[in-house]
């Protein structure tokens, strides 16, 4: 029997932690997590990492906000179950196929926000917009994130593997 919080279908990635801000009254702390993803549609489970940050922050009652500044990623809450993750990836491919035409990738038409080294990633931007979740806020009670029995916090890479960031802000209500 697996333990309730054991990772099943998602990746746990190596991260570098940077404390960006801590209020003088210890009412809030903000962290940046730096990490590398490996592949398109990779699910990275950050539940334990976020819980550890909350535990070390000494915030008993408040909230945590997790945010990513990347338009080709998503933060979602769901089960860490291989079947679900495979279903999610399959449906995402059906809705936004990799081999479709994306005007974003058409350099003969596009004139805005262009870079020489840019990825061909129109589908990744569309997928990110459909999912529409680059941040989540959750309550913290007794120094624990309030999540359902099977819920996990995922960072989902919708583009190719590369360096990414998550920002975590923990606020105390006391």
Protein language model regions, located:
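Active-site histidine-anchored catalytic micro-motif
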Residues: 2-174
């Amino acid at each position: 029997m697996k333990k309730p919080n054991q990772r099943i279908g998602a990746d746990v990635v190596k991260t570098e932690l940077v404390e960006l801000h801590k209020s003088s009254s210890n009412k809030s702390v903000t962290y940046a997590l730096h990490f590398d993803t490996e592949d398109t549609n990779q699910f990275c489970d950050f539940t334990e990492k976020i819980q550890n940050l909350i535990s070390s922050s000494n915030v008993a009652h408040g909230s945590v906000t997790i945010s990513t500044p990347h338009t080709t990623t998503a933060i979602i809450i769901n089960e860490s179950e291989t079947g679900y993750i495979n279903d999610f990836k399959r449906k995402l491919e059906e809705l936004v196929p990799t081999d479709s035409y994306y005007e974003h990738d058409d350099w003969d038409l596009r004139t805005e926000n262009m870079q020489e080294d840019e990825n061909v990633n129109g589908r990744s931007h569309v997928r990110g917009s459909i999912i529409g979740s680059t941040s989540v806020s959750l309550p913290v009670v007794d120094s624990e994130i309030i999540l359902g029995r099977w819920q996990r916090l995922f960072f989902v890479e919708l583009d190719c593997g590369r360096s990414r960031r998550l920002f975590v802000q923990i606020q105390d209500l006391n």
